[in-house]
A protein has these predicted regions:
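The conserved beta1-alpha1 loop
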Residues: 50-54, 139
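Gly/Ala-rich beta-loop-alpha elbow adjacent to hydrolase catalytic centers
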Residues: 118, 137-142, 146
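Generic beta-sheet signal
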Residues: 47-49, 134
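Lipolytic serine-hydrolase domain surface
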Residues: 1-44, 55-68, 73-132, 151-165, ...
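Residue in the alpha/beta-hydrolase core beta-strand immediately N-terminal to the catalytic nucleophile
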Residues: 135, 139-140, 165-167
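Receiver (REC) domain switch-region micro-motif
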Residues: 49-50, 166
Length: 255
């Protein structure tokens, strides 16, 4: 287990659920929680945040992102708990041009499949505590996990407003994702209050990914394109680099 100064960071995990080579599903299990009693305690409180990391994060790398999120939110006087969402994102070959495209495709497959897992955790949490406010925070590829989660939740009208808010940082999803004819209606239905997209034209990773055509123009690079839903807003920021720590430093208020 991953430990931090004698305490185990609360997290939902799907590590080992998907093949890192091709994205194939290896188990029908929805998720695992650590430590169970702490997760149960958090779920039964008035609200909590789920932080979803990006690509190329092993267990320890993911943990670092949760700690960054928790520290930043505490500094902004947010008093509620953060739960980490840990998934198979440590894809081999992303850092090499010769294998980057195939590796990114695998990462995208796994991120999309994790929507099913995260959606189930959210539904289970709301079943135990219907009044809990659940906020999502996603960095880079974590935005895709969130998008896929919203798509699944939107299939049932009973899930209306089940998510309180969403914060995206350097998101890798397409720039037209919040158009009403794309995924906008699903977000408008599922999110109760707001979706905030933190984007940066200076993000070197998203710039390279766009120029190399590894991904469609990401919403975290130059913001949203075209018509957007009313619950969506965006903020242009100047992080030092693509890392979550740099984006988190641009967050001046929460929620």
């Amino acid at each position: 287990m991953i430990e931090l100064s004698s305490k185990i960071f609360p997290r939902v995990s799907t590590r080992g659920f998907y093949d890192l080579q091709n994205g194939k599903t290896l188990t029908n299990t929805y998720y695992e929680i650590y430590p169970p009693q702490k997760i149960e305690t958090i779920i039964n409180k008035s609200e909590f945040v789920i932080m979803i990391h990006g690509l190329r994060n092993n267990k320890s790398g993911a943990l670092a992102k949760y700690i960054i999120a928790e520290k930043r939110l505490k500094r902004l006087h947010y008093k509620h708990s953060v739960i980490g969402y840990s998934y198979d994102s440590n894809i081999v070959g992303v850092q090499y041009k010769s294998t980057a495209i195939s590796a990114l495709k695998t990462g995208l497959i796994i991120a999309k499949k994790n929507g099913r897992n995260l959606a189930r955790f959210i539904l289970d949490a709301k079943k135990k505590n219907p009044l809990a406010k659940i906020r999502l925070m996603g960095h880079s590829l974590g935005a895709q996990v969130i998008l896929s989660t919203i798509e699944i939740l939107a299939k049932n009208s009973k899930n209306r407003n089940i998510i309180e808010s969403i914060h995206l940082f350097g998101g890798s999803i397409p720039s037209n994702s919040f158009h009403p004819k794309k995924f906008g209606r699903s977000f408008q239905m599922i999110v109760n209050k707001k979706i905030i997209n933190f984007y940066s034209p200076y993000d070197e990773v998203l710039k390279a990914a766009t120029e190399e055509q590894w991904v469609d123009t990401p919403i975290g690079y130059k913001g949203s394109v075209g018509l957007n839903i009313s619950k969506y807003t965006q903020r242009r920021v100047t992080p030092r680099n693509h890392r979550f720590a740099s984006y988190a430093a641009t967050l001046n208020s929460f929620p």
